[in-house]
């Protein structure tokens, strides 16, 4: 069974054939750190974290880089408004980003490069492009000459004319062509800047990723991921810079892009004021619920994110954890059987997480129907955990999941449950009902089964 992924560059699904099976290389565009990240920033993290997990299952050595853009006009503006150094603001929000992503069960990438630590590589790549006739200096700027590249626009499937018609292009007098983009720009005295052959300045956004990939992953990588909004101009320009700097050598073999997020049926945008930060959502829902919601649609499709979706995701996870909680017997690890399972096949088909999640529910039904101590139940639980782990789900102990976040004293709750159990044995059913209602009023729900009574937070 081969991993198949949709390649934006060819606009079709392809078998994944790595450049070097001994070292799989994947890069995903990370955040520009000037504020708390919104749910749209989280989707590529969760999507490509899932791919990272699948690749780690398939290959011994997977190198995953996700950058931090810590120099940008937005960061400069936010720092000025806050009256704090740019580096301090960027460091603070980078830490907040990592904190939020950890709450979503995202693994730490192999490499987390910061843009400001790669100025030497950025200047060197810019100089190489000038030397090769693909870039030119003008009025303190260095610009990439898009007309110097014969297949510029191939990734986004646009002509130069289409790009100018459909994009916000800065028309500056120092440009040879309106579509030329900035590699290096001058910095005013009050702005951050670095010395270069073209004067004191700072890099353009597109250059940063190209330089970081070159340093840490080499000239050609297997997978480059990000949101669909990055296809043009960011990824198109990355590809142009890197391939022209390396004499046409292929930059990326497989380009992958996740779809947009809509909020309550409307596209998330600043103008609509419907941004939802991950931190805001974490105040109401566990991170695993948010992750489940993000995986509930196939990654290339648009996702309608809403409170209803989060409630549905919480209910689904409750059901899955309920199956894991059903028996205390030791599980049987899935082992090699995972690779032959329908759920694994779904993930191998361009990360079809909705289908894989439906397989988790099927396994949960098997657990519920089987005798708790049976091999069938334990095998199904083992398969559930193995498949869920590839999606970063079911990472909690079931008891912790159901009891987590309850502020009530656990010993008090369990003492009342024991009293209720004794009341039932003594046929004092009115008292047993009183205890149930008392706990319910405190947000604690009881579940009776033949194995005993368990509780969870409402």
From Swiss-Prot:
Subunit structure: Monomer.
Pfam families the record matches: CysS_C, DALR_2, tRNA-synt_1e
Membrane-crossing segments per the record: none
Protein name: Cysteine--tRNA ligase
The encoding gene: cysS
Span(s) of short sequence motif 'HIGH' region: 31-41
HAMAP family: Cys_tRNA_synth
Catalytic activity: tRNA(Cys) + L-cysteine + ATP = L-cysteinyl-tRNA(Cys) + AMP + diphosphate
The family this protein is said to belong to: Belongs to the class-I aminoacyl-tRNA synthetase family.
Residue ranges the record marks as coiled coil: none
Note accompanying the cofactor annotation: Binds 1 zinc ion per subunit.
GO molecular function: ATP binding; cysteine-tRNA ligase activity; zinc ion binding
InterPro entries: Cys-tRNA-ligase (IPR015803), Cys-tRNA-synt_Ia_DALR (IPR015273), Cys-tRNA/MSH_ligase (IPR024909), CysS_C (IPR056411), Rossmann-like_a/b/a_fold (IPR014729), tRNA-synt_1_cat_dom (IPR032678), tRNAsynth_Ia_anticodon-bd (IPR009080)
Organism: Teredinibacter turnerae (strain ATCC 39867 / T7901)
Key words of the record: Aminoacyl-tRNA synthetase, ATP-binding, Cytoplasm, Ligase, Metal-binding, Nucleotide-binding, Protein biosynthesis, Zinc
An example Gene Ontology biological process: cysteinyl-tRNA aminoacylation
E.C. code: 6.1.1.16
Compartments, record wording: Cytoplasm
């Amino acid at each position: 069974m081969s991993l198949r992924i949709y390649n934006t560059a060819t606009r079709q699904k392809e078998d994944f054939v790595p450049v070097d099976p001994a070292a799989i290389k994947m890069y995903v565009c990370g955040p520009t750190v000037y504020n708390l990240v919104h749910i749209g920033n989280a989707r590529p993290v969760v999507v490509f974290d899932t791919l990272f997990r699948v690749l780690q299952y398939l290959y011994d050595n997977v190198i995953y880089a996700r950058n931090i853009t810590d120099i940008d006009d937005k960061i400069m503006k936010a720092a000025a408004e806050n009256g704090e150094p740019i580096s301090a603001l960027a460091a603070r929000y980078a830490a907040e980003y990592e904190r939020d992503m950890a709450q979503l069960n995202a693994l730490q990438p192999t490499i987390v490069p910061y843009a400001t630590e790669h100025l030497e590589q950025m200047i060197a790549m810019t100089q190489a492009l000038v030397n090769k006739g693909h870039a030119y200096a003008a009025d303190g700027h260095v610009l990439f000459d898009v007309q110097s590249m014969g297949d510029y626009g191939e990734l986004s499937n646009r002509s130069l004319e289409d790009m100018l018609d459909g994009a916000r292009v800065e028309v500056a007098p120092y440009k040879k062509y309106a579509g030329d983009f900035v590699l290096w720009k001058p910095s005013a005295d009050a702005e951050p800047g670095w010395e270069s052959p073209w004067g004191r300045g700072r890099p353009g956004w597109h250059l940063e990723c190209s330089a970081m990939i070159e340093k840490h992953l080499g000239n050609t990588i297997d997978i480059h991921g990000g949101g669909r909004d990055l296809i043009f101009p960011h990824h198109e320009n990355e590809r142009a810079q890197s391939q022209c700097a390396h004499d046409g050598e292929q930059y990326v073999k497989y380009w992958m892009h996740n779809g947009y997020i809509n909020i309550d049926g409307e596209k998330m945008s600043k103008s609509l004021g419907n941004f939802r930060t991950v931190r805001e959502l974490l105040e109401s829902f566990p991170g695993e619920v948010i992750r489940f919601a993000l995986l509930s649609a196939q990654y290339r499709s648009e996702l309608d994110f809403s409170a209803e979706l989060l409630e549905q995701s919480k209910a689904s996870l409750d059901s899955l954890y309920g199956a894991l909680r059903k028996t205390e017997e030791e599980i049987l690890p899935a082992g090699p059987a995972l690779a032959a399972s329908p759920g694994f096949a779904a993930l191998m088909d361009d990360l079809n997480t909705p289908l894989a999640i439906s397989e988790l529910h099927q396994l949960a039904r098997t657990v519920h129907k089987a005798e708790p101590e049976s091999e069938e139940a334990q095998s199904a639980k083992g398969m559930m955990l193995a498949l869920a782990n590839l999606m970063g789900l079911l990472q909690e102990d079931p008891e912790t999941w159901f009891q987590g976040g309850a502020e009530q004293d656990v010993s008090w709750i369990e003492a009342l449950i024991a009293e209720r159990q004794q009341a039932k044995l003594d046929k004092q059913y009115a008292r047993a009902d009183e205890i149930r209602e008392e706990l319910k009023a405190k947000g604690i729900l009881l579940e009776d089964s033949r194995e005993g009574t368990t509780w969870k937070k409402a």
